[in-house]
Amino acid sequence: MAVDTETTTTTIPVTDSDRIDDQNNLTSNAIPHASEKTVPDSPASEQNEVSDESEDKPSKTKKSFGFYAIIVALALTSLLTSLEATITSTALPTITSELGGASLYVWVVNGYYLTQTAFQPFVGQMADIYGRRWPMICSAAMFTIGSGVAGGSKNIQTLIAGRLLQGIGSGGILVLTEIIICDLLPLRERGKYLGMIVSLVGIGAALGPLFGGLIVQYSSWPWVFYLNVPIGGVACLMLFFFLRVRSDKTPNYMQRLRRFDWIGNVLFVMSMVSILIALSWAGTEYPWSSFRVVVPLVLGFVGSAAFVVYEGSSFCVNPTMPLHIFSNRTSGTAFAVTFLHTLSSVSVMYFLPVYFQAVLNASPSRSGVQLLPTILFMIPGAIAGGTLLSKFGRYRPLQHGGLAFMIIGFGLLTLLDADSNTGEWVGYQLLGALGTGLALPVLLPAVQAPLTEEDTALCTATWSFMRTYGFIWGATIATAVFNNRFDVLAPRITDTTIGSQLTNGRAYELATKVFMNSIKDPVTQREVKSVYVDALNVVWYVSLAFAGLGFLLVFLEKEITLRKELDTKYAMEEKKKKPENSEA
């Protein structure tokens, strides 16, 4: 609800539903409540500033057994989705050797990310219309069913279909986990639990390649996917029995369907699919200049522009991604910082294994172990960030601190070379990992602080999308600059045969211990490692630059008081509530 700062009347909201933004610039459709009080000739409200002494006291919400059961179920599903995102990286060669379809293998990985990304805003709107309970249960069930389909596949096409189902389910899980945590806890307390979930996601992503390698080595590849079925089944049952939350129900089924932004969702999904197809082909299947890359990329960006125009038009009654969540300075900046934070951190995590395998001659499994310092220090960083946010209620210092650590850590990576010892490559990872974890759980609260609780589902879905989108572009940009720099430096390799093998986008693919050991001449091997080191330095510098840009953008955010009271119509059902007030 906007407040006219030119008048002498001050509006004091009684509930957090009427949250006004910083600088009173939020022009949303919030409806005034009857409980609002108007105090004439009072001093300007200071509700957006962290000035009250009581604001430093951490909030405490009474938590039932059902609350913790829900958190456990959300943690299990989040762990599985992150594990499944990386587990195929080491298992894929074995899978394709048995199923065939080598020309389609890339979609076993990319299909998962494609549907995971494209359907996130749609799931956010579904949560607004149907409540949180059934969309979450259905997302977890779809992920579990997709895992069963993938595990039981007899050909590559069925495997890809299973991965597409897994992706849709995982996208829903990512969005709804964060939405449900926001429904269960006031804004001041959310960071702590978001930090816990982020930690589990980091553990899953780290263990994925290791689990994939162990499964194909000591068991059979279907268990790469089957392992999700029993655990996912347990999580579904826990959600069914304990995720009892209130729902804003519309009795008429057709009225609910009409509330969906069908045109906007179709435009968004088609645009994202087009962009992601182009990015999956660029630099690997086809050069960036190929029409097979350029055409879908252009169509995707044009479709994205059309989506934005439509969402802001009068024709869109119930937008999937309302533009007012971006027009606010603090939330809009926090979205951008989230994208840059993810892009820079993913670029580093994506290419550290290249350094370990191509430069230090590590095996894939050994490389996974060498990456553990990043994951292990990201986890306490995330927990610390969430805990400090709950205690002090200030997100800007934590964002600045996290991004500063990332800048220093990524800068130190430029010192790595073929002669670096264990202490160096472990130590240099620690600062970047700590900073990545510290900033992550305090980004979503910064988005939500100036917005109303009615915006929770849609702004959370948008934030989750920005994070996933940053992941995709982080890998894409890092790969592009790495390949380009490697091609420029390749003439330094005196053996032209080896040099030609590594150019035109193949340096990343051949960054393995097996390939490096196939180079028998020690001088040539040293030259190749030197080119890898210098090409990787460009990746570290680019990651540093994006983190630096994020650091500067944080100055645009305002430090807004984080709400200590829970004001949502989707809170947990109380035992004495009538059945019609809860989701069936």
Swiss-Prot record:
Gene label: gkaD
Functional summary from the UniProt entry: MFS-type transporter; part of the gene cluster that mediates the biosynthesis of GKK1032, fungal natural products containing a macrocyclic para-cyclophane connected to a decahydrofluorene ring system that show potent antitumor activities.
Keywords associated with the record: Glycoprotein, Membrane, Transmembrane, Transmembrane helix, Transport, Virulence
Region annotated Disordered, chain positions: 1-60
Name of the protein this chain belongs to: MFS-type transporter gkaD
Glycosylated residue positions: 25, 328
Pfam families per record: MFS_1
Main location: membrane
